[in-house]
Amino acid sequence: MTEQLQPLRGMKDLLPDDYKVHDYIINKARDVGVLYGYKQMSTPIVEYTKVFNRSMGESSDVISKEIYSFLDKSNDCVALRPEFTACIIRSIISNRLQHKLPLKFFSTGPVFRYDRPQAGRQRQFHQLNYEYIGAKGAITDADTLKLAVDILKALEIEQDTTLELNSLGCNESRRVYQQKLVEYLNDFKEQLSEESKIRLSKNPMRILDSKSETDQKIIANAPVLSEYYTDESKEYFEELIQYLDILGVKYSINPRLVRGLDYYCHTAFEFTTKKLGSQSTILAGGRYDGLAKIMGNNDDVPAIGFAAGIERIALMREYDVSEVKPVFVLPIGKNNICYALEIVDKLRTENIAIIIESLGKIAKRMQRIFNENAQFIIFIGDEEQANNNLKIKDLKKEEEYIVDFAKALELLKK
């Protein structure tokens, strides 16, 4: 018996009904982005693995456990993209776009992470991604956060989310804080999870993201980053809060919300929900002024961005997405097919969606049409063909018309 082929675990087909919802979400988000001056771009799905090694760090979960990385036939180490930000920065550098900064880019498409599949968390999933490159200051961060809010509003889920906000401060703030954090965690070194023991020497701030219950109990009494803000960091965060209040953006300050990579600074944020269980983050982002230099640019480039999971958004509510219902053309006999094809072609040039049903018995063809919830059927038999007429049945109104092409066009375009 021939093996029945299946998709890879954690990778799902997007069937028409799913794709319809995805398309709706993307279009809504794109339209909001346009109002903020964002332009769409795309990058390859496959990049050199070093693009992500540099951006995410070799000790990160994504690089150490989740990335789809392999040698291609040229013996180059390449990877399926696990996120967009590194790809966008790489593109700006390789296309020498630095002189055009600031730039606002919107991207969307699949990303890949080898993780345990569950609802709202697949190995191939789709993201909306926004990057504001080359602009610094709290006003830029406020504008970016308002964009995120407006996207969630357009998708009718903003009311079910909470904006969790924190400041990572400047480099000096984080340097001092990291020292204090290590001093505190060293007292609990033997109690930390094995993963956190490794992170303690490599990237201690990542321990704050640990999912281990034991680690969480230890972290609960750890020093808080805000205690070590410089005057500059305090002023930056206070300015951001002022702008958000003016814009009417509601937020909850979460002092434990951090990013474990050195190139992140100042603003970090997540929009979370209680509707999706453990997969509570819908949209997340932050400021990453140091990434471009790490990736080979001569200088730091100020930047802020965020990504949102399309599958998770789709789980938040049911979207009743309307779609164009095609008109069905049904030639009665084989000798009516040529005339039917002419009619179909003429109607399509008038931007009317048409499907010709010419295969099988009339009853079966009619059943297929009923299954599509069509409104109009055009019957073409010998009489219609001889008189250059069309018989149109309106299934909703339960009315029937025999009209010429011009009248048919008028009826179908109503």
Swiss-Prot record:
Highest taxon, organism lineage: Bacteria
Enzyme class: ligase
Name of this protein: Histidine--tRNA ligase
Keyword Transmembrane recorded: no
Gene Ontology terms for molecular function: ATP binding; histidine-tRNA ligase activity
Species of provenance: Rickettsia rickettsii (strain Iowa)
Family: Belongs to the class-II aminoacyl-tRNA synthetase family.
Catalysed transformations (reactions): tRNA(His) + L-histidine + ATP = L-histidyl-tRNA(His) + AMP + diphosphate + H(+)
UniProt subcellular location: Cytoplasm
Biological classification of the source: Bacteria, Pseudomonadati, Pseudomonadota, Alphaproteobacteria, Rickettsiales
Alphabetized Pfam families for the sequence: HGTP_anticodon (PF03129), tRNA-synt_His (PF13393)
